UniProtKB/Swiss-Prot annotation:
Subcellular location as annotated: Cell membrane
Free-text activity regulation comment from the record: Activity is inhibited by ammonium ions. Photoreversibly inactivated by 1-iodopropane.
Keywords of the record: 4Fe-4S, Cell membrane, Iron, Iron-sulfur, Membrane, Metal-binding, Oxidoreductase, Repeat, Signal
Residue stretches making up the 4Fe-4S ferredoxin-type domain: 411-440, 478-496
Catalysed transformations (reactions): trichloroethene + chloride + A + H(+) = tetrachloroethene + AH2; trichloroethene + AH2 = (Z)-1,2-dichloroethene + chloride + A + H(+)
Stated name of the protein: Tetrachloroethene reductive dehalogenase
Length: 551
């Protein structure tokens, strides 16, 4: 039998077998996982593309990082008018209750404001004050928001807050952190901090020394360099790694650093913050200090022009994410943010010791998702996150820019966009209704976008003001869209089922149901997740299970 005829025969056979297999949850889980995997490879093969896989209009302009939800917080202009949603009432679009439209008023009431909704700045600072532990959440002492849960969250975020410069919000160039000097003769710690570089450190002073001594490591080829760098990146802590070519389209058009000012804390120490926390806590309102702005000049701030970007992914804990929107789910996000800085710093040191320049970055400096797509790590999903084949959206992305020329990976397609068109589970699970219910992505025009979105690229609309408003109300980040995602599994056969479902007309309408039949993820409805006791039970399971569920 010829190869083409054999393939067609196998495809037809696999379609029938796979359709029968996915009809029985127990059969799939216990007996026919290899069959499903084989079927997926034939029915929905993984493909590589040489070009960026999504449309980018000629009108596209680089994204201004100061427009993202958290960076916009520190623009004093954002504190003058109520926060604005792109759609005032999404029930007119979805036909379902808009669970997010009242959040600005509820958040204002938390701040003691009567008669108007909260501003963008008030909304974000309400979240950040609770997130830092300086203000109790409204669910304080409920299961998932207890002092034990909050302490775990604080520990998980500690490196990001204390040693990374809180670049989770964006920023650049590099990071700056306040540290308290210690007198080595008396062991006394100063009350006033000094500003020093954080883990996202762009100091490349050692590189020239290595080169001048003739010690720069020479790889035999770009391919060998990529192989060695990827191996090192995994050893240094990354779960997934890919190489993207440097693409200026994804570098922010403006870099910015939050202006920090000294605030006297109740313990007498001085803490440098981008908002006046004591004033807020005493009922004096929310005051922010703005940004220092920088042109994105690589040579000026990092000493080199990038040629390659090492993009890596860190897995988030499956059990912790299941507890969303509890503080436990925030803790695994914080752990990944803390680890992002550590791993990126170690990769940068590795490159510098080889005699190559490096700039380690988290969410700052450039757009991580399109770089990760270019690096072959996954596809962009409905929820705006990178969907990887192994972890789905349950991860965080960081990157290291370098002047070492590496052989780039290619973008990969494995059925995510086709599945997202059919599923819409993340949109249904969002408490703020921030995720589009439209079936297909499109090249967004300015009128389709809220202020934090960049038009002229192909994607689904997201309203970060709605998302951020729920975070403020919840007192903690929300990961519902990650928790319920059909790609968020620890058994990869489920991903194969998802790929197959997008290719079989009889199964397409049931695509999102498969993992629900198999007992994953809990309720999709955000109110039901809490009211049914599901979240509380997942929190108890998290604390009572001594071993983490691993991929």
């Amino acid at each position: 039998m010829g190869e083409i005829n054999r393939r067609n025969f196998l495809k037809a056979s696999m379609l029938g077998a796979a359709a029968a297999a996915v009809a029985s949850a127990s059969a799939v889980k216990g007996m026919v996982s290899p069959l499903v995997a084989d079927a997926a490879d034939i029915v929905a093969p993984i493909t590589e593309t040489s070009e960026f896989p999504y449309k980018v209009d000629a009108k596209y302009q680089r994204y201004n990082s100061l427009k993202n939800f958290f960076e916009k917080t520190f623009d004093p202009e954002a504190n003058k008018t109520p926060i604005k949603f792109h759609y005032d009432d999404v029930s007119k679009i979805t036909g379902k209750k808009d669970t997010g439209k009242d959040l600005p008023t509820l958040n204002a009431e938390r701040l003691g404001i009567k008669g108007r909704p909260a501003t963008h700045t008030e909304t974000s600072i309400l979240f950040q004050t609770q997130h830092l532990g300086a203000m109790l959440t409204q669910r304080h002492n409920e299961t998932g928001w207890t002092g034990l849960d909050e302490a775990l969250n604080a520990g998980a975020w500690a490196v990001e807050f204390d040693y990374s410069g809180f670049n989770a919000a964006g920023g650049g160039p590099g990071s700056v952190i306040p540290l308290y000097p210690i007198n080595p003769m008396t062991n006394e710690i100063a009350n006033e901090p000094v500003m020093v570089p954080g883990l996202y450190n762009w100091d490349n002073i050692d590189v020239e020394s290595v080169r001048q001594q003739g010690q720069q490591w020479k790889f035999e080829s770009k391919e060998e360099a990529s192989k060695m760098v990827k191996k090192a990146t995994r050893l240094l802590g990354a779960d997934l790694v890919g190489i993207a070519p440097y693409d200026e389209r994804w570098t922010y058009s403006t870099w910015g650093r939050k202006i920090l000012k000294p605030c006297k804390m109740p313990n007498g120490r001085t803490k440098y913050l981008p908002w006046d926390l004591p004033k807020m806590l005493s009922g004096g309102g929310v005051e922010v200090f703005g940004h220092a702005k920088f042109e994105p000049d690589w040579e000026k701030y990092a000493g080199f022009k990038p040629k390659s970007v090492i993009v890596f992914v860190l897995e988030e804990d499956y059990e912790a994410i299941r507890t969303s929107p509890s503080v436990i789910s925030s803790a695994t996000v914080g752990k990944s943010y803390s680890n992002m800085a550590e791993v990126a710093y170690k990769i940068a040191v590795f490159l510098r010791k080889l005699g190559y320049y490096a700039a380690p970055c988290g969410n700052d400096t450039g757009l991580s998702v399109p770089m990760a797509v270019q690096a072959g790590l996954g596809e962009a999903g409905r929820n705006g996150l990178l969907i990887t084949q192994k972890f789905g959206p349950r991860h965080r992305i960081a990157k290291v820019y370098t002047d070492l020329e590496l052989a780039p990976d290619k973008p990969r397609k494995f059925g995510v966009r086709e599945f997202c068109r059919l599923c819409k589970k993340c949109a249904d699970a969002c408490p703020a209704q921030a995720i589009s219910h439209e079936k297909d992505p499109k090249v967004l025009q300015p009128e389709d976008c809220e202020v934090a979105e960049n038009p002229y690229t192909e994607k689904w609309h997201l309203d970060s003001n709605r998302c951020g408003s729920f975070w403020a109300y919840n007192g903690s980040p929300c990961a519902n869209c990650v928790a319920v995602c059909s790609w968020n599994k620890v058994e990869t056969w489920n991903h194969d089922v998802a790929r197959i479902a997008t290719q079989i007309p009889l199964l397409q309408d049931a695509a999102r149901k498969f993992d629900e039949w198999f007992g994953y993820n809990g309720p999709v409805n955000p109110d039901e997740r809490l009211e049914s006791g599901y979240v509380q039970n997942m929190v108890k399971d998290f604390w009572n299970n001594p071993e983490s569920i691993k991929q």
